[in-house]
């Protein structure tokens, strides 16, 4: 959907995104005129599983299998001499982040945040390239924060560099084929190669060119690349920031990223991810689903599919199984809760559509009894931004990990043959019905 009218990147652009979300409309948006920049802004690329499927030229139910297969059968990048990302090169005194239409999303955000950038850095241990999305607050025309969660690969790489007393060269890629952002959500070992996963998703190698000011290759066909280094001897306050929990994350120290160059296409399009919108949650949840599905498949042979719904802010997982024995639902819920830091796992039968929150709620209300179907696991590690998490050591201790009580719900029907059948017209009739024959 084209937005031809002029919009301000400070709140107004995100207000359009929010209003459409409230109206249950999630089109890909291109804002053609953004105050203060010549670049258009595109958003909502990952607003739903359907969007992800379109990007990967598949169907929604095949997104996760395709993603996990690409992680196993990666295709390494290839080096080329040049590419469109070199059309415009801003280095030295010409470096100015203000040329980019970086958006301020929420009323109390600390400032404009780069929310879609895929940061590429080299792992000093393996020598391989690592890619991940981290949030970046603009602190000056030449500096950003680099806010990385404590357990992510980027944070580990920076910590290793800090011990060795050197900085980390990095490149922030803003805008490329959606497969790059999708691949960056890969969870697992630090040695895993996200750029190889992207190649497998595209069925061709990712073209890379040498950066201008750092010793790294960067994607040749990117819209924008911000080159620089992550300081390992200096920190800056980052926040407040509207996060995927849909609350403000409080200010916390983050590493400083010093910009040494900005390169971009002549007709570059800036990609923005609405930080408190479905796009953030859908993309973020993709990585969880990939790793959890792979782990659960080994523990739950009758697993059919999983879904991390947007409504759960990354803390809820639906698990669909082909139940053969009573008790399998509880076992599947325990396995799901152990596979990731979900606060709640709901297990349903194969006749329940896990991509429809209403159908899952229906199963919970008609196939469970609280004293038999629901269990709790106290004292489990939870996300550092959980507003209900409690410190492990003592109240108010900022260094303590946050803990939570996890909830498992077995919403599968008992195998007792006396349990009633679902009432509906003949399933084969309505599932294969061509409505065009009846509706005009």
Predicted regions and their residues:
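Extended, highly charged
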Residues: 1-256, 261-440
């Amino acid at each position: 959907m084209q937005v031809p009218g002029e919009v301000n990147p400070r709140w107004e652009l995100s207000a359009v995104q929010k209003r459409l979300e409230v109206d249950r409309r999630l089109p890909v948006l291109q804002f053609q005129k953004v105050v203060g920049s010549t670049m258009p802004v595109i958003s909502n690329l990952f607003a739903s599983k359907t969007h992800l499927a379109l990007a990967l030229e598949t169907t929604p139910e095949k997104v996760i299998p395709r993603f996990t297969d690409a992680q196993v059968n990666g295709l390494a990048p290839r080096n080329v001499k040049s590419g469109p990302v070199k059309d415009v090169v801003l280095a030295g005194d010409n470096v100015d982040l203000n040329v980019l239409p970086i958006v301020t999303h929420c009323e109390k955000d600390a400032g404009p945040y780069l929310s879609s950038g895929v940061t590429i850095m080299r792992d000093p241990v393996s020598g391989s390239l690592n890619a991940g999305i981290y949030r970046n607050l603009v602190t000056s025309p030449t500096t950003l924060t680099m806010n990385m969660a404590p357990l992510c690969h980027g944070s580990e790489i920076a910590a290793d560099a800090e011990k060795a007393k050197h900085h980390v060269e990095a490149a922030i890629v803003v805008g490329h084929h959606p497969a790059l952002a999708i691949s960056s959500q890969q969870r697992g070992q630090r040695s895993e190669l996200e750029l190889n996963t992207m190649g497998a998703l595209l069925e061709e190698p990712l073209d890379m060119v040498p950066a201008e000011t750092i010793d790294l290759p960067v994607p040749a066909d990117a819209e924008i690349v911000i080159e620089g280094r992550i300081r390992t001897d200096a920190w800056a306050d980052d926040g407040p920031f509207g996060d995927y929990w849909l609350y403000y994350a409080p200010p916390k120290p983050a590493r400083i990223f010093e910009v040494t160059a900005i390169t971009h296409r002549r007709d570059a399009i800036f990609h923005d991810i609405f930080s408190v919108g479905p796009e953030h949650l859908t993309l973020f949840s993709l990585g969880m689903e990939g790793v959890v599905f792979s782990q659960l498949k080994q523990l739950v042979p009758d697993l059919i599919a999983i879904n991390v719904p947007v409504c759960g802010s990354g803390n809820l997982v639906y698990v669909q199984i082909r139940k053969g024995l009573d008790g399998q639902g509880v076992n599947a819920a325990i396995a799901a809760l152990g596979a990731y830091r979900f606060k709640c796992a709901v297990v349903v039968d194969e006749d329940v559509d896990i991509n429809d929150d209403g159908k899952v709620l229906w199963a919970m209300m008609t196939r469970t009894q609280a004293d038999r179907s629901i269990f709790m696991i106290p004292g489990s590690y939870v996300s550092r931004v959980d507003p209900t998490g409690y410190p492990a050591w003592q109240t108010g201790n900022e260094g303590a990990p946050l803990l939570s009580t996890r909830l498992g719900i077995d919403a599968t029907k008992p195998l007792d043959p006396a349990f009633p059948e679902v009432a509906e017209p003949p399933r084969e009739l309505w599932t294969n019905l061509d409505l065009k024959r009846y509706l005009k």
